[in-house]
Structure formats: structure tokens, C-alpha cells
Amino acid sequence: DRICTGITSSNSPHVVKTATQGEVNVTGVIPLTTTPTKSHFANLKGTKTRGKLCPKCLNCTDLDVALGRPKCMGTIPSAKASILHEVKPVTSGCFPIMHDRTKXRQLPNLLRGYENIRLSTHNVINAETAPGGPYKIGTSGSCPNITNGNGFFATMAWAVPKNDNNKTATNPLTVEVPYICTEGEDQITVWGFHSDNETQMVKLYGDSKPQKFTSSANGVTAHYVSQIGGFPNQAEDGGLPQSGRIVVDYMVQKSGKTGTITYQRGILLPQKVWCASGRSKVIKGSLPLIGEADCLHEKYGGLNKSKPYYTGEHAKAIGNCPIWVKTPLKLANGTKYRPPAKLLKER
């Protein structure tokens, strides 16, 4: 008679690494990893996802929306996840801005980090009667409103001395900026200042010297001195050429907290403010958002989770995402492989 062992006689192609025995051949494995391929970014399943700050504001950058450019006013939808699609936001199309002097480029990114964002229905201060006034509110043909008349950003008032009596140099003046949001939100208050060449500075403000500006809120203070002249004429988005520039900044005021702005001539006083609450997870990506996905990954776009782990490029991801591992993982679902037993000799 011949006696045979009851195991498979085929070779095992499966090798797993174990903690105690190193590489081991097994009779079966379940792959636990996948290597994604790049895809479009998508809406995160089960979550409101925000692409542009204002989806219905056509031909507007997120910076336009954040500053309140006249033709870029609209509702910002609530969202638990937001796509940072403008890595370096382009300049606003309303008036030449000196971006490199402040954190103005960060304003859209700041807003994206909130779940709920709304613009106040009324102004935070009366700019016409602010210290150093009376003022007339300046507008620009480069910043047309919805009726194509001259306009300016909704978040700021360009305070130009109203008559020759107060069109003079001034010592630093201070205005308090109250908290006006009504639901305990963070108040994001936008402000800035305008400067031009000496001739225009005298014409507008009665003073051609550099002007000083300071803002303070929530323990954060910023100081600026305006630059006079040296600007080439610049037109934004088909507007009129401008010899002047504006510097834009913002301050975050917590519930009930008052901020202050100290200024001289050329101030852009805060007007409508952003009231923002909740948190929205932000990830770098691209638009448009197509379909839905379990996970949004900076390198791969929208991913649907088919395995618990993934290999490939490691980057920030949000949602129901697989976990990055350096090498593929396998789960053994069979037994340790043993080579076929040799037949016993006949007795």
C-alpha cells in the first residue's frame, strides 16, 4: 500500500513577512493595499464640499469675493470640507494691491477654514464721520458696480477728506472697531490704506509724506508705513490705469472684542465684516468637483476606499481615507505552506 499526506501538492506563490519568522510561504493571502491613480477632485461623500467661495460669482477670484468686489457679491455656501484651488491667489480685479506687504493673500484661505461664512448686513463704523473727517467715500472707475458706475470694495471705505478745511496733514488718529456679529462668530475685519505719488497725495489728502497705520485685535498688532510714489501705471482686469496702490490687511476679532485702527491720511476704513463659525477641513486641489468620493487626497484627487491601506505618494488627505504605508501589506487567510510529502516506500 501507499500512504499520502492530505495537503496540496502545488507550489505556493504567496510570501508574507512575519514579525517572528521573517518571510513565510502561505497557501492564501488577501491584499490590504492599493496604489491609487490620479483622478478629478470630487465632493466628499456625506459632507458638503466647497470649491469656489462663491460658486455663483462668475469671473471672480476667491480674493475678489473675500474683499467684496462689487460684481463679486454672493452667498458663500456652508461646507465641512473646502478645496484650496488658488495656491497663489491672483490679484483682485478691482484696484492694484501691494500683496507682498501684508497677509492679504491669506484672507481667502482663512475664510475657507470656516464652515459658515456670511457678510454683515451693515457697516461696522460710519466712515464719513470717523476721526479726521468729515470724509467723502472714494470710488474708482476701475472698480465698477453692478450698474457699471464707479465703485469700491464692500469691506472697505476709501476715506478722502471732504473739503479743503480738513485736507491737511494729521497726527495719528484712532478709531475703535466694535464687534457686530450676532451669533458669537469670529469677526474678520478687512481694512487698508491707499498711497500714490506726491502730486496725487497732496491733491487727495493735503500731505505728501509717508503715512503711518496700525491695527490691533485679539492680541495681534500690525504696523505699516505707506510708500509714496514709484509705482508704474497699472490696470486691473481691463480697468483704468492707476498710479496709486492699496495695501490690504485684516484682523480677527473674537466674540465681544473690540479692535482698534490708528491711521493717518489714505485710510481704507472697515465697512462690512465677515462673520464666520465652525471648522471646514481644507485641502489643496483643483476644480471642477466631479462626482463623489470617500476621500480627497492632495496628490491623487478623489479616491474611493477599496482597501484599508495604500502605497505611493504620501500627502494630506481628508475623509474616509486609506492609511499610507511604505510597502504593500497582505493578510494571510490560509495556512503555512508545506511542500508535498514524499511517498513512503512500499512495505
From Swiss-Prot:
Membrane association type: Single-pass type I membrane protein
SUPFAM superfamilies according to UniProt: Viral protein domain
GO molecular function list: host cell surface receptor binding
Residues carrying a glycan: N25, N59, N145, N166, N304, N333
Family membership noted in the UniProt record: Belongs to the influenza viruses hemagglutinin family.
Miscellaneous notes: Major glycoprotein, comprises over 80% of the envelope proteins present in virus particle.
Known function: Binds to sialic acid-containing receptors on the cell surface, bringing about the attachment of the virus particle to the cell. Plays a major role in the determination of host range restriction and virulence. Class I viral fusion protein. Responsible for penetration of the virus into the cell cytoplasm by mediating the fusion of the membrane of the endocytosed virus particle with the endosomal membrane. Low pH in endosomes induce an irreversible conformational change in HA2, releasing the fusion hydrophobic peptide. Several trimers are required to form a competent fusion pore.
Protein name, as recorded: Hemagglutinin
Species whose genome carries this gene: Influenza B virus (strain B/Finland/145/1990)
